[in-house]
């Protein structure tokens, strides 16, 4: 079993820091269809340069296209995916099942990972992701170490799990708290991180 240390790269400084600190891979976004819209992210040219920078140092690059999209938005997302493929991206993370089907048609050689936003929290869910052609499943952040270990033992594909960072109280991909409280949808990449706010008693009427 090989362990991979994966770190987020929300901008150039974060990318360099992750690589210099020993990350085996980084995940990053460019364009409008990733779950890290609050990060600086990368332009097309910056993304191409970032992939080259990482690959020269033996570091893999994963693109996040892991938000829900509408039919109207799908062509633009597909164009971003093609650009990433041309840049040599190592894999793409997705949430939307329609995006999965589209990318399998237009860039069939690029591995696709099931984002934590897909709410995969059982072995059967991971097995279904594998059946549909995904090569890695990012488990939801709410699972215990024991549950993660059990899934890893029987999973037919690679498993990724969060060990540091935002630890949501709701199942990943199913939380509407940010949208209700701050009118910012976590499923559209704009989560306000309400579960990180100081808690108090509030009367709800």
PLM feature spans:
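Hydrophobic alpha-helical bundles that form the membrane domains of multi-pass transporters
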Residues: 92, 132-133
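Conserved nucleotide-cofactor-binding alpha/beta core module
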Residues: 122-124
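Active-site pocket-lining/capping segments in soluble small-molecule metabolic enzymes
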Residues: 1-120, 138-139, 147-205
């Amino acid at each position: 079993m090989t362990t991979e240390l994966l770190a987020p790269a929300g901008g150039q400084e974060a990318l360099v820091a992750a690589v210099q600190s020993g990350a085996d891979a980084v995940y990053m976004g460019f364009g409008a269809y990733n779950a890290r819209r609050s990060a600086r992210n990368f332009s097309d040219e910056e993304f191409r340069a970032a992939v080259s920078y990482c690959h020269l140092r033996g570091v893999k690059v994963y693109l996040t296209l892991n938000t829900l999209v509408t039919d109207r938005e799908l062509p633009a997302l597909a164009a971003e995916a093609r650009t990433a493929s041309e840049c040599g991206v190592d894999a793409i993370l997705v949430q939307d099942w329609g995006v999965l089907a589209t990318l399998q048609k237009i860039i069939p050689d690029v591995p696709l990972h099931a984002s934590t936003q897909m709410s995969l929290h059982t072995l059967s869910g991971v097995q279904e992701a594998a059946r549909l052609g995904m090569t890695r499943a990012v488990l939801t952040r709410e699972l215990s170490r024991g549950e993660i270990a059990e899934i890893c033992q029987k999973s037919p594909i690679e498993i990724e799990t969060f060990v540091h960072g935002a630890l949501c109280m709701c199942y990943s991909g199913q939380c509407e708290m940010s949208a209700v409280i701050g009118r910012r949808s976590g499923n559209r990449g704009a989560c306000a991180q309400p579960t990180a706010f100081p808690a108090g008693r509030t009367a709800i009427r």
